[in-house]
Every structure is written in C-alpha cells, then in structure tokens.
Amino acid sequence: MTGDTEKEQEPSSGEQQLNVLKRIHEILTKHSSTQTEFIPLLYHSLKQISKHPNNSSNSLDAATSSIRHRLKTAKTLLQQDPAAIELVSKTPEQWQLHIQEKKIELEKKTKHLQRLRESIQKQ
C-alpha cells in the first residue's frame, strides 16, 4: 500500500512535460510593469537608441537584458527535458496530423478491447 501512495504522489512523465511547458509559457508571457512583451520592448529600445545614440542608458544590451534572461531560463528548462523539445518542435499542422493518427489508433484499440470483452462474456 505504501508503494501505491508513492506512485500517486509522483507526477507521470506527461505531467512533468506539461509542467515544464507551463513554466516556459509563464516565463515567456509574463505581463507586468517590469516585464513587457518582447516585440514592443525591442521596438521601444531600438526607437530610443535611434533617437539618442550617444546616451549611455539607451543601450540595446541593457534594454533587452530581461528578454535574454527569460529566453535563457526557457532554454535551460527545455534542455532538461528532451520530450519537451519534441513537443515544441512540431508545427500546428504536424500536431493535427499526429492527433488524427492517435485518434485512429485509439479507435482501433477501443474496438479490439470491446471484442475481447464480448469474447470473455461469452465464455
């Protein structure tokens, strides 16, 4: 019984992948006054640099440090879980095809299981 409760507490590999992807999503999409979206921040930084190129506080490196930090954190998380890399490497079209294949496979397994149940009930 102790082994069963330990298994229930450990997340499955699918849950671990989902947790990694959730953490990456949170890192890359945080919205607050200090962490804005990537594109507007880059646009603003480039505009400021073009307006005042000699101002030392208008460095692209300084302006984009938060973006680089968030991307490095996401990259580290991805490197820790090869399955997560596979998940994010497919295009939406590839995922649609993959989902269709899995649905067909599941239907076949369901039909096979139903036939097995029927044959067991006959005995």
From Swiss-Prot:
One of its GO terms (biological process) is regulation of transcription by RNA polymerase II. Disulfide bonds: none annotated. Component of the Mediator complex. The keyword Oxidoreductase does not apply. Keywords: Activator, Coiled coil, Nucleus, Transcription, Transcription regulation. Component of the Mediator complex, a coactivator involved in the regulated transcription of nearly all RNA polymerase II-dependent genes. Mediator functions as a bridge to convey information from gene-specific regulatory proteins to the basal RNA polymerase II transcription machinery. Mediator is recruited to promoters by direct interactions with regulatory proteins and serves as a scaffold for the assembly of a functional preinitiation complex with RNA polymerase II and the general transcription factors. GO terms for cellular component: mediator complex. It comes from the Eukaryota. It comes from Kluyveromyces lactis (strain ATCC 8585 / CBS 2359 / DSM 70799 / NBRC 1267 / NRRL Y-1140 / WM37). Pfam families: Med9 (PF07544). The keyword Flavoprotein does not apply. This is Mediator of RNA polymerase II transcription subunit 9. Its main location: nucleus. The lineage of its organism: Eukaryota, Fungi, Dikarya, Ascomycota, Saccharomycotina. InterPro entries: Med9. Belongs to the Mediator complex subunit 9 family. Residues 95-123 form a coiled coil. One of its GO terms (molecular function) is transcription coregulator activity. The gene is CSE2. It is found in: Nucleus.
